[in-house]
Amino acid sequence: MRVYIIIWIILSMGFRAAAQDKLLVAGSGNPNILLLDKQTGKVEWQHALEKGEECNAVALTRKGEILYSYKRGAKLVTWDHQVVWDYKTPDKTELQSATLLQNGGVLLGICGVPAQFIELDKKGKEVNKVTLNLEVERPHSQFRQIFQLRNSNYLIPVMAKQKVLEVSRKGKIIAEHQIEGKAFSSLELPDENLLLPCGDNHCYIVIDRKTGEELKRVNALDIEGVALLFVGQILQLKLSLIHIS
C-alpha cells in the first residue's frame, strides 16, 4: 500500500526540544502518528491508530494536544494518549479533514451527500455547520484537506471535479475555479494566491485567487535532486521557503 505522508511542523512543544527540529507526521497507510527528529529521523513518540482507521490530517493545537482525522471521525488526544474528545461521523460518510481554525477551534470536513463542514470550539462543541452538495456521489472521491482562509471562508479542493471552491461560513460559494489536477490540500500564500498540491498528478500549482488563472506549475522532475511523487501537503516556512510532503 502506498503511504501518503501528511506533515505538520510543530509550532509549540513545551517540554520538548526546539520546535523547528521536530515533525509530526501521519498518512494513509501508516498505522501510527509519529513525532520525528527532523535531523536524524528518529521516532521520539508514536500514537497507534485503531484497526481500519486512516489518517489524512494531523495538527498540534496551541494547548499542545494532537488533533487528527481517522476517516470515521476525528480525535483530540494528549501526549499520554488520553482522548480529550472523539467526534464520530455517520455511516456512508468519511471524515477526512481535521484542521485548526484561527480562533483555536477545529474545522472538520466530512465527505458525504451532502458534504458537511463543521466548526468545533476548543472543547469540541459544534458552533457552526455548512452543508454543500459537491455533486460527487462517491464520498471517498470528494476531498481530503480543508482549511480556513484568512478571511474566515473555507477553501475546498474537490478532487473528482478538479476544482477549488471558496465557501463562506454561511455556505455561500464565493468563488469557484477549475484547475488541471486533483488538489489534495491547499496553502494560502502571503499574496493571497493559492498553492495547491495535486497528489497523484505529481505536481503542485499556484493559481490566482481571484481569477483561477494558473500562475505556476512545478512538475515531478522540476526540482533538482528531488522527484515529486504523491504531493500531499505543502507548508510555508520562513525566508520564503516551503516544506513539501
Show where each model-derived region lies:
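An edge-strand/N-cap motif at the start of beta-rich repeat modules
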Residues: 19-45
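Residue-level detector of Asp-centered blade-edge/turn motifs that repeat once per structural unit
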Residues: 20, 60-63, 101-103, 148-151, ...
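Conserved beta-propeller blade signature
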Residues: 23-25, 65-67, 107-108, 154-155, ...
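Short loop/turn segments immediately following the C-termini of beta-strands
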Residues: 28, 71, 111-112, 159, ...
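Short loop/turn segments that connect beta-strands within beta-propeller blades
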Residues: 38-40, 78-82, 121-124, 168-171, ...
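Surface loop/turn motifs at the tips and blade-to-blade linkers of beta-strand repeat domains
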Residues: 46-51, 87-91, 131-139, 176-180, ...
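Repeated scaffold domains used in trafficking and secretory/extracellular systems
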Residues: 53-59, 92-100, 139-146, 181-188, ...
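Conserved small/polar residues in nucleotide/adenosyl-binding loops
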Residues: 242-244
